[in-house]
Each structure stands twice: as structure tokens, then as C-alpha cells.
């Protein structure tokens, strides 16, 4: 699974052979320049889902439910899940474990597939004190190993079709995956998950900084900068447009 936020990149990602395209609320940090994902709205998520759907990809389209769109009530969760499906998503994704199991069950009950998301959940940015690795402590408190296993099982029991496991030790992600009947998709969770997801801009080397877990498979940021600098130089020198790129 790889993220995309518009038709152009959705078609590129799809041509690369991914199984799923995530229209993530990471659009807030990747495209909008925000510090975290909390500010993105339902309207913005609908807009980006519509753009990705316009590419008519073979890959499944996963629509992220943004912060505030499902936490307050089951009614909100169902209503906003339907909005994303109508915009073109085929699965909706929401963050949390035990405390959102009722929302997952309600959305699933109207035949909308739900993908869960446990571990480091970016919408819990303030409670976690930032984006910090989870599952390194024992006990029943939020973020502990035992709690994350409980969260994963609760998400499955509520009817989720898959679950993202983010930012946890690889041995814990492997243990959680082994306890589930539904697929797990890891990000910063090691090789033991059933699948993997990366933000497209990290994968392509477009991001200004690289996270430890995110391997850049290309260096498009520097290549793009070099190309633009060459364009600027040729325009300023009068070298371009040349006869080949002009009409007679």
C-alpha cells in the first residue's frame, strides 16, 4: 500500500503494481505543510479521494477518516464513512483500538469495509506527546504491549477487514500479526506484518527529511530541483525555447 492524493500520482502508483492506494490524512503534513494531521477536514479528504478515484486505479482505494470525523459518536462515524465511500473510497480507515470498536462495528454493519490502525496513531499526537514509538512498556496503560494486542483483537472482533500497525517494535508487530485472522499492514513495524505501507513522498525521496523506517527508493527531490534549475538557467540565457519547441 502506498499513499496518493491526486489522479496523477494515483496512476503512477497503480502502474507500479500496488494492491492498495491510501488517500491518507498525511496530506496535512505532506502537501499542506502542517505540523501534524489534526487539521485536515472531511471536505478535504473527500476532495482528495475524488481525485484519486478519477484515475480509475485497479488498486483498492482506502480513504482515511480524519480527526473529529468519527470519535464523538457512532452516528458521526457512519455518516462520514458513507461520505468517503460516495467520494470514491472502497475501504475507510480509522485510528484506535478498543475505544473505537463500536464505531468500526457500526460502519461494518452497513457493508462498508473498515481498516483499523493501531500503535502509533498520528491523530493521538497530543496525548502521545508527539509521534513516539509505542509498545515498549508492560501493563495495561495506553501504548503498552498488552494494550496494543488487546486493541488489535478488538478491531478484528468489531469487523475490520485489515489493520495498520504503526511505530511498534518488530517483535510485537509479528506477535500481533500471528494472533489475527485479518491481514496486518506495517509501517515502522518490521518485516513480520502481512503487508507494508509507505507515504509516497518518502518512498520517492521527495520528502525533505527521511524517517528511520522509510527507505527512499529514489531521489526525486534532488532530481526535480536539478531539472528546475536547468529550466531557469536556459530561460534566462535564451537557450530555451529553441526551434524544436516552437511553432512556425
Segments the model singles out, each with a brief description of its role:
Residues 1-218, 222-248:
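Alpha/beta enzyme core
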Amino acid at each position: 500500500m502506498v499513499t496518493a492524493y491526486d489522479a496523477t500520482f494515483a496512476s503512477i502508483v497503480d502502474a507500479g503494481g500496488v494492491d492498495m492506494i491510501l488517500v491518507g490524512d498525511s496530506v496535512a503534513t505532506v502537501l499542506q505543510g502542517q505540523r501534524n494531521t489534526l487539521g485536515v477536514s472531511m471536505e478535504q479528504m473527500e476532495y482528495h479521494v475524488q481525485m484519486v478515484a478519477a484515475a480509475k486505479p485497479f488498486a483498492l482505494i482506502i480513504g482515511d477518516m480524519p480527526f473529529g470525523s468519527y470519535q464523538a459518536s457512532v452516528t458521526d462515524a457512519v455518516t462520514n464513512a458513507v461520505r468517503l465511500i460516495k467520494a470514491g473510497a472502497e475501504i475507510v480507515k480509522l485510528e484506535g483500538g478498543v475505544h473505537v470498536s463500536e464505531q468500526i462495528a457500526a460502519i461494518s454493519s452497513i457493508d462498508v469495509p473498515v481498516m483499523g490502525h493501531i500503535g502509533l496513531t498520528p491523530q493521538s499526537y497530543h496525548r502521545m506527546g508527539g509521534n513516539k514509538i509505542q509498545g515498549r512498556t508492560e501493563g495495561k496503560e495506553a501504548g503498552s504491549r498488552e494494550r496494543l494486542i488487546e486493541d488489535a483483537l478488538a478491531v478484528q472482533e468489531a469487523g475490520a477487514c485489515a489493520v495498520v500497525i504503526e511505530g511498534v517494535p518488530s517483535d510485537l508487530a509479528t506477535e500481533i500479526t500471528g494472533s489475527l485472522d485479518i491481514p496486518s499492514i506495517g509501517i515502522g513495524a518490521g518485516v513480520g506484518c502481512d503487508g507494508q505501507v509507505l507515504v509516497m513522498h518518502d518512498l520517492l525521496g521527495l520528502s525533505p527529511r527521511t524517517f528511520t523506517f522509510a527507505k527512499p527508493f529514489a531521489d526525486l527531490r534532488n532530481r526535480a530541483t536539478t531539472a528546475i534549475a536547468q529550466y531557469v538557467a536556459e530561460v534566462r540565457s535564451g537557450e530555451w525555447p529553441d526551434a524544436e519547441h516552437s511553432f512556425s
